[in-house]
Amino acid sequence: MVKPCWRIGAGMERSKINPTKVDGLTWYKDLGLHTFGEFSMAMIQANSVMEDQCQIESGPLTFNNPTVQGTFVGVYDGHGGPEASRFIADNIFPKLKKFASEGREISEQVISKAFAETDKDFLKTVTKQWPTNPQMASVGSCCLAGVICNGLVYIANTGDSRAVLGRSERGGVRAVQLSVEHNANLESARQELWSLHPNDPTILVMKHRLWRVKGVIQVTRSIGDAYLKRAEFNREPLLPKFRLPEHFTKPILSADPSVTITRLSPQDEFIILASDGLWEHLSNQEAVDIVHNSPRQGIARRLLKAALKEAAKKREMRYSDLTEIHPGVRRHFHDDITVIVVYLNPHPVKTNSWASPLSIRGGYPMHSTS
Amino acid sequence: MKHLIRRLSRVADSSSEFSIRRSTSSFRNRRGHHRLHAPPPPWSICPARRVNTVPAGHVPVYVGEEMERFVVSAELMNHPIFVGLLNRSAQEYGYAQKGVLHIPCHVIVFERVVETLRLGGFEGSGDLENLVASLLSGDELIPETTE
């Protein structure tokens, strides 16, 4: 059993207090304790630079109201580079605390404001770097955030990561999806874009048998991706593949999260939050069955391995041979994958753990071949 | 792109000395334990049409329009030249292709590239060096989508 002995720290010092491990391309924390129970985290890199980031923060969720205690979980699946997902991991939780402090509580509006300001600030960074680093305009990230507080779980999602609740039912466990996703290959996301851009016949284009916004990107909402939000970036020196042939006035992608609020019941055992890299290989029910039927220690790594075995099977190769494939090349077999399993207890684990907040960040720095 | 296809065709015309049979025997040698003086070749290739299961350490790929199936060593996948072939695949079919990876390259060129890699690289092979330079350069070979 891991004792709740964590303190907030920074950089290396923090990682000594909260030992996390790296094994080749895998980063993991097999078991830890958050305000309402245990958790397990694991990530694997497939791109030449790890584009996924994640974090878990447990303790006070405001700066001024010590009674608002809870757990914040973030999964950030970057694309076009790691800068946007890293920016979110650096900024979204402090912003959430700032907005929560204004009303001295957590709410849907607080979370949405944290998303909006994180996007706004990232776009400011893009503007600042435009003369020297214009490719920042084509970097973006999905953002999945879960907040557990006062018996409620808030799931806010921009992009196509997913949160799934495991609810015990007649001797088994049922998967209940808590997140709403924004991917052009979902009918609802396509309808939304078509209705927002009725005069643009090329707002969605099928490419490689998949729907893509402007023929480029699958997610229909994101943090970053400045080139699809502000026309000022739709010009040289941005790479031609990101430049749209026509001028646009209305942002094509939005950073607004879809937020769901669920009151937790004693039947709610755990929540799995993961980037789409996991869900392209495991169904919601397969994932909750694995968690329900396995020991808690290392459960996130177990899910990761199940997804990788499935990825290897699809390419008709052995899992052990997949592990020989280097980052970058790996992307042809699977995506970067992040998975966090948060077990739920109806009451805080230990009252005195409130004084010992937890802060763990995953995915940076990872192996880089570029 | 047309330039690259022409180059591929030209190399293909001069590659008759490399055969699948030779590749197959080299694969068998790699599995043997009694070879003296000659260490097992680091990379191998064999046609997989008559092989029911993929040998350990290998990955199947489909090559060319005819979708000829080969197995190549997992180690070979990491070679920059092979990465160039995989990037062509992602550019043509995306990362989310279902099942075995499909490499858009003439079968005969593919065999020659892999065989040359197996025999120790590209030194002194001008045509292939040019081919590889083509494979590894140019924006057209970078996947055009972002994921």
From Swiss-Prot, chain A:
EC number(s) recorded for this UniProt protein: 3.1.3.16
Protein name, per record: Probable protein phosphatase 2C 67
One of the GO biological process terms: negative regulation of leaf senescence
Keyword Lipid metabolism: no
Keywords, ordered alphabetically: Cell membrane, Hydrolase, Magnesium, Manganese, Membrane, Metal-binding, Protein phosphatase
Cofactor(s) the protein requires to work: Mg(2+); Mn(2+)
Gene Ontology cellular component annotations, sorted alphabetically: cytoplasm; plasma membrane
UniProt GO MF annotations: metal ion binding; phosphatase activity; protein serine/threonine phosphatase activity
From Swiss-Prot, chain B:
A matching Pfam family: Auxin_inducible
Top-rank taxon, per record: Eukaryota
One of the record's GO cellular component terms: cytoplasm
Keyword Iron: no
Tissues in which the protein is found: Specifically expressed in the quiescent center and cortex or endodermis initials of root stem niches. Expressed in vascular tissues from hypocotyls, petioles and cotyledons.
Protein's GO biological process: auxin transport; auxin-activated signaling pathway; positive gravitropism; root radial pattern formation
Keyword Cytoplasm: yes
Alphabetical keyword list: Auxin signaling pathway, Cytoplasm, Developmental protein, Growth regulation
Induction or repression: By auxin.
Subcellular location: Cytoplasm
Protein's job: Plays a role in the regulation of cell expansion, root meristem patterning and auxin transport.
Extra information: Plants over-expressing SAUR41 display pleiotropic auxin-related phenotypes. These phenotypes include elongated hypocotyls, increased length of primary roots, increased numbers of lateral roots, increased vegetative biomass, twisted inflorescence stems, overexpanded petals, reduced seed setting and increased basipetal auxin transport in hypocotyls.
Protein family (similarity comment): Belongs to the ARG7 family.
Entry protein name: Auxin-responsive protein SAUR41
Gene that encodes the chain: SAUR41
